[in-house]
Amino acid sequence: IPVEDASTTINFPEDGTYYVYARTYNWTSPWSKAKGPGRFILKIDNKRLMPVLGDEGEQWQWQSAGKVSVKAGKSILSLHDLTGFNGRCDAIYMTTDMGKLPPEPKEELEAFRRNMLDLPFEPIESSEYDLVVVGGGIAGICAATAAARLGCKVALVNDRPVLGGNNSSEIRVHLGGTIEVGPNKGLGRMIREFGHSIEGNAQSAENYEDEKKSKMIADEENITLFANCRAIKVEMKGEKIDAVVIKHIETGEEQILSAPLFSDCTGDGTIGYLAGADYRMGREARAEYGEDLAPEKADKMTMGASVQWYSVETSKKSCFPRFNYGI
């Protein structure tokens, strides 16, 4: 089933020819020189701009999407993904000055973006909390709720509009872990309060019952949910985290959340990494912890990535896009 276009209404201040640029990334470029799978195009008032974007280059970059002649007033800008959820687009920039691009260096681009969006140059200081939980997946939901029920004032930061992480309707990995085993018989019991009742990966969105997770958090008076917000940096006092800076993924607004304790539930160890904590990727050698299933020598192998899908009957034929992941 084709992915619906991502669309928004924009207001052109004057008639004219506008040169259009998209900031994109060919995300398979670190391991492949071939054209990437993240191909997309732009449309203005349903008129296609011809260049295909997102499938070349080796870093985030501004790509020309061509030019368009428009009348002053409102228009619909649409991003049409050619392969389904594979495109990468950070920003779209339009100008009547041919060849005038935003800056590329990170600091200069950040200042340019703040100026264009009329954002303050310093993050907003938010309330202090007893605990800041970063990541609104299953681990984050449980950590925030457990602390809140013990009387802690909790901030829960989630970079998506829905809770659940991999178990949300956006990713659709079911809850299949074994719980309540070993010496801690109650461990994992909280999942019963919001877990979905239908098993299976990559099923219909409603199977994952996002509303249960939302209600779970909304019902806890001690939890403040920061939805659509991503932690982008940490502030340190010595070797301890003093605060995290979060950015709203739609508005670009930033806030500072302070607390004596932080729980990294990002799934990628993001907060620990930003704080300079030691980390490793891969599998440790068998001799290090005496695990029978560990390799004899340490290696870089990590969990694989699955391309999951399901099928539905429709009234017309559809095709599966052909593309190359470069592996």
Labelled PLM ranges:
Residues 1-123:
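Extracytoplasmic
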Residues 125-137:
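Beta1/beta-strand and adjacent pyrophosphate-binding region of the FAD-binding site
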Residues 127-129, 251-261:
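Core beta-strand elements of the Rossmann-like FAD/NAD(P) dinucleotide-binding domain
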Residues 140:
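N-terminal Rossmann-fold NAD(P) dinucleotide-binding loop
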Residues 146, 152-153, 158-240, 280, ...:
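Conserved N-terminal/central alpha/beta ligand/cofactor-binding core
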Residues 235-256:
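Conserved beta-strand-loop-beta-strand element in the redox core of flavoprotein oxidoreductases
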Residues 261, 265-270:
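Glycine-/small-residue-rich beta->alpha transition segments that form the dinucleotide
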Residues 271-327:
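Rossmann-like dinucleotide-binding core of oxidoreductases
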